[in-house]
Amino acid sequence: MSVKYIFVTGGVVSGLGKGITAASLGRLLKARGLRVTIQKFDPYINVDPGTMSPYQHGEVFVTDDGAETDLDLGHYERFIDENLSKNNNVTTGKIYWSIISKERKGDFLGGTVQVIPHVTNEIKNRIYLVGKEGKTDVVITEIGGTVGDIESLPFLEAIRQVASDVGRENVVYIHVTLVPYLSKSGELKTKPTQHSVKELRSLGIQPDIIVCRTEKRLSKELKDKIGLFCNIPGEWVIQNLDAESLYEIPLMLEEEGLANIVCERLNLGCVKPDMTEWCELVNRQKNLSKSLTIALVGKYVELHDAYLSVVESLNHGGIYNDAEVKIKWVNSEELTEDNLEETLCDVDGILVPGGFGDRGIEGKILAAKYARENKVPYFGICLGMQMAVVEFARNVAGLKMANSSEFDANSPHPVIDLMPEQKDIDEKGGTMRLGLYPCKIIKDSSAYRIYESELIYERHRHRYEFNNEYRELLTSKGLILAGLSPSEKLVEIIELKDHPWFIGVQFHPEFKSRPNRPHPLFKDFIRAAVERRYKQQENKND
């Protein structure tokens, strides 16, 4: 069977959920026995989002091979349960970087380098490349941005050409649009969708399927109207209603018949999907019997997308433990000695995620101190681990001026320091310790109990590490170095003695958690938090 290509575009406004639509369709096709991969094209000129502010871009998702990518790749991996690579996220910056490099080498033999054919050919090559990896049956490609954006034009022209290259029978175009509801008149308005499709058709792309984001159900008459004006059957107009949980959306789109239409259009046969596991997952999530509160202490808390994978991983752990996880967003810049007790006294666990820069670090250190002293389950990820080490050094080991050299280059006790191989690097983009690395776990540790393995592989994104000059002192005071790199030069996991659950990790476990396979650390962190909550309730009742 030849590879099939599905392109997902968006219209009217951004943020409609193209990524979730693509991920959900991927899940539905995989449930039909097809081998699926998903790809995202981002029209911005940055080579990758690694140096972009979380306020502008949200989370940076890291793949096994060390690519810093769009957060939608996290959705893709969680929904289709496959590990993606650097080839699954392509930006305008990457495209132009590649073309200019080729031009400088003389690869174009003196020709004039133009958007068509050179840029469009480079884009198409990236599409075909993922289709050749892993014996893929279906490639789903999401085009970032909105139809009408000047930045998207080369990508739209490239996907138009794909139909000519591989045959129109092997391509499906899906357009995601907004059907707004006017509460005053009680009407759903289709005109924005009509104009968006008109714009897309003016570029040579006739959508096969239109997915309508809406807060109210679409009647058959309304679907037929959209179909009439957009030149498709009314049955191929799909409603995508607001949902309480992201994981309901594949089931809602299955009910609408999206995957069946795609299979019919691509001649993939009519195979009944096996959605048993997914249905059970959603059913469990809807019927959780317990609840708990986790404080997420960070500096980007105004934009929840900055910690998207962490939040999803907490939810995965909650579903596994039959507990609804309520997140208390705590701005680390505003956390002080004066409000520490008041802010954290009602939480069942504290999580300090990764980050960069000195803003808000003292608040994170205070959160680690509160967790240590009050026996509250503490989970430190990347910077969260480093701040736990700084707190321990200051308040347990007596190194009052301890700090990370990232924040205080003149600290007399830099218990966290720049990795040696990073010291001669001037460029910021793509130069950190990135991607999957092994870690050896000592047997007599909580980490070994949780992982049930002496060797694990986790994804990393950092420049700074535990300073080995302080190993002996800090371990003598009760810090456990539970996980090390195979060379034993890098500290990967720290724990505390005499604490119910206090673990810091240099890596990012949130990037490997899946709804059907929660990450072991998140599973056990939530277990410990649930245990603490219900023990406290029992003590109050006594």
Curated annotation (Swiss-Prot):
Indicate which residues the UniProt annotation says bind Mg(2+): 72, 142
Q: Which residues bind ATP?
A: 15-20, 72
- Domain of life of the source: Bacteria
| EC number(s) given by UniProt | 6.3.4.2
What are the recorded GO MF terms, alphabetically?
ATP binding; CTP synthase activity; glutaminase activity; identical protein binding; metal ion binding
Q: Residues that bind CTP, according to the entry?
A: 14, 149-151, 189-194, 225
Enzyme class name: ligase
Q: Any inhibitors or activators noted?
A: Allosterically activated by GTP, when glutamine is the substrate; GTP has no effect on the reaction when ammonia is the substrate. The allosteric effector GTP functions by stabilizing the protein conformation that binds the tetrahedral intermediate(s) formed during glutamine hydrolysis. Inhibited by the product CTP, via allosteric rather than competitive inhibition.
- The secretion signal range is none
Annotated active site residues, numbered on this chain, are 382, 508, 510
UniProt key word Magnesium: yes
Segment Amidoligase domain: which positions? 1-268
Domain (Glutamine amidotransferase type-1): give its ranges: 293-535
Q: Where does L-glutamine bind?
A: 55, 355, 383-386, 406, 463
GO term, biological process aspect, one: 'de novo' CTP biosynthetic process
Family annotation (SUPFAM superfamilies): Class I glutamine amidotransferase-like, P-loop containing nucleoside triphosphate hydrolases
Q: Which Pfam families does the protein's record reference?
A: CTP_synth_N, GATase
Keywords from the named record: ATP-binding, Glutamine amidotransferase, Ligase, Magnesium, Metal-binding, Nucleotide-binding, Pyrimidine biosynthesis
The pathway this protein participates in, as annotated, is: Pyrimidine metabolism; CTP biosynthesis via de novo pathway; CTP from UDP: step 2/2
Query: Which NCBIfam families does the UniProt record give?
Result: PRK05380.1, PyrG
Q: Which family does it belong to?
A: Belongs to the CTP synthase family.
Describe its assembly: Homotetramer.
Function, as annotated, reads: Catalyzes the ATP-dependent amination of UTP to CTP with either L-glutamine or ammonia as the source of nitrogen. Regulates intracellular CTP levels through interactions with the four ribonucleotide triphosphates.
Q: What's the further remark here?
A: CTPSs have evolved a hybrid strategy for distinguishing between UTP and CTP. The overlapping regions of the product feedback inhibitory and substrate sites recognize a common feature in both compounds, the triphosphate moiety. To differentiate isosteric substrate and product pyrimidine rings, an additional pocket far from the expected kinase/ligase catalytic site, specifically recognizes the cytosine and ribose portions of the product inhibitor.
Q: What is this protein called?
A: CTP synthase
